[in-house]
Amino acid sequence: MKWMVEINDLDAVQARAIENIIDNQDENHWVKGFAGSGKTIVLTHVLKRLATARPPVKVCFATFTHALKDLIESGLTKTELDRIDISTFNGLGKMRNDYDLVVADEMQDIPSRVLPTLAKKSDVLVIAADLDQSIYRSACSVSELNAAIKPAREHQLREIHRINENVFEIATSVYTDAKVVSQTTVRQDDEQARMYEGASMRDEFVTMYEEAVRVSAKESPSAVLLPSKALLDKFISTIATANSYTGTPPSVKDSERPEIGEQADPFKEINAYLKKNKSPLQVFGGGSGSLYDSDTKKMVYLMTYHSAKGLDFANVFLPHLTEDVSLEPMKGASDDQERRLFFVATTRARERLYLSYHDEPHRFIEEIPDYLLETFNKQKRNY
């Protein structure tokens, strides 16, 4: 999957941040920036430089999700991977305690209970964190994060490369508390987000699936994001029935979660079922699925909003934005938590964004100005 940006294609601020971090490896560093400004890309280039440093540097990379861990691994060469330890935050306890420095992405989501473990790994932290994208209830407080990293050199990225102005305005029209620092620029193009009103859930899911397959290409996969694993099951079941898949699809929701720190592949059964039926669908996240598959064939990745954190895809679909759905599956979700999740989900889109619903639309849909959305019309089939 195309996501990594070559060093010569970085903007000047990104390049300076990398050089400053490499030149000051005995200090803490905090890379900041709006969603899509390239924080993960900066950290990945830092890892590349550290992996080839002489004398050798003992370095660990850590982040919250298996999906983002897998993404980082796909951006490194085999030689670089051999020289870097990579872990989720939950798996840090099994790592060594004498790193020269730890590089950590999505630090706004690190649980409070993991901070003492992180502190034992190294005296030097290089992190990326965007407080607007904090979506986990277990996440540490702002004061705890500041205490863990400061004093630190701050690197503020000001150019938003991933999303265009249309997606930026959609995301910030729903999550109006998103902080945009002065002199921030957003990519300009004519691509407009699309809205589809399904006649039923089946019509909505099948239509969005068919479009996701149509616009997918090698190295430019589509991603269908849904709020919960229960909805992933509904989506898969609907597509399986519509396409006459053989057998009953295993459940995503009931898949066994691995123990902390062990090798994870919780959706092995459902992905084997999809592969057997020659489906381009693949459940990605939690250690299951592979981004490498999209390098050689059309893929449609199926994920929860939470699992998509930190990733980006050429084509992003957000179905089931229907009146009665909560975007945060845990009970007692606040309005702010749902808005942050919508913000995170929409800002995964690198080229195309599709929103859809059936029956009555979710309140967030009604908050988006009409001029930001164009009506999606079904593609005519060629027989």
Q: Each PLM stretch: what is its role?
A:
Residues 98-114, 125-128, 132-136:
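SF2 helicase catalytic motif II
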Residues 37, 66, 85-89, 93, ...:
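Core RecA-like ATPase module of SF1/SF2 helicases and allied nucleic-acid translocases
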Residues 61, 124-130, 156, 355:
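Structural recognition of the conserved hydrophobic beta-strand(s) that form the central parallel beta-sheet
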Residues 2-27, 114:
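N-terminal pre-P-loop "Q-motif" helix
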Residues 195-220:
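Conserved interdomain hinge at the start of the Helicase C-terminal
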Residues 60-100:
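Inter-Walker segment of RecA-like/P-loop motor cores
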Residues 24-46:
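Walker A/P-loop
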Residues 133-137, 144-190:
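Conserved coupling/interface region of RecA-like P-loop/ASCE motor cores
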